[in-house]
Amino acid sequence: MHAMGMLHLVRHGQARFASDDYDRLSELGQRQCHALGRWYAARGQRFGAVITGTLTRHRQSLAALAEGLGALPAATEFAALNEYDSEAMLRAALAEPTLAPPGPLPAPTTPDGYRAHFRLLRQALAAWTAGTLNVPGMPAHAEWRAGIATVLEHVRTQTEGDVLLVSSGGPIASATALVVGAGGDAWVALNLRLRNSALTEFALSPRRPVLHSFNTLPHLHTPEQAHWVTYA
C-alpha cells in the first residue's frame, strides 16, 4: 500500500530529431534536464524511488537531472516505458493505402515537411490504437498500454513517498489517459503536445493515482529560456 506521495513523470530532454541517431540528447536537451534538477534542488525535493525506460535518451536525461539535483536512488528500468517506434509506425502507414499520402513523404527538415511528418504519425497512432494498423516490431496497442499500466501498479504497490519516472511522450501520455479514464486515441493528442523535460504529476494514494499537473515547465520560466521550449 502506497504512502501518500507524488509520481513525477518527466519526458526526456530534446533529442537529435531528424538525425541518424534520435536516441541521444542534444546539448539543449542536456541543459533542459539539468535545469529541472536544479529546480528540484532549490525546493529540497527528495525521491524515494527512480524509474526509467531503457533508452539512451532516458538514461542521459536522468544523468543530467541528477547532476543538477544531487544524489538519487539507483534507477529501476522498465522496457515498458520505452517510446513506440515512430519510424516503424510511419513505414507501416506509408504501406497502408488508406493512410499513405499521395507522393513521397517529405523529410521533416522544413516547416511543411515537419507538419506532414506529424500529420501522418498522428493518423498512424490512431489506427494502431484502433487495431487497424499492424506495425512490424511493435506489439498491439492494447499490449503496449498494458505494460504501462503494469508500471503504474508497481509504483502503487512497491514504492514509498515521491517517485521520479523518466520516460518518453507516448508512455507518459498513455499513463495520463489511463489515470483520467480517457479511452480510444485520446492519448495521441496528449502525446503530441508534451514538451521536452516537461513535468507531469500524479498524486499517489493506496487506491489509484490522480492527475495533479500535466506538461508543465516550472524550471524554464525566464525570458532567456524561452527558446529552450521544444517538442522533439
Language-model features and meaning:
Residues 5-8, 13-67, 140-145:
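Loop-to-helix element that buttresses phosphate recognition and phosphoryl-transfer chemistry
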Residues 13, 169, 215:
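Active-site metal-binding loops of divalent metal-dependent hydrolases
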Residues 37-120:
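Phosphate-coordination/substrate-recognition cap region in phosphate-metabolizing enzymes
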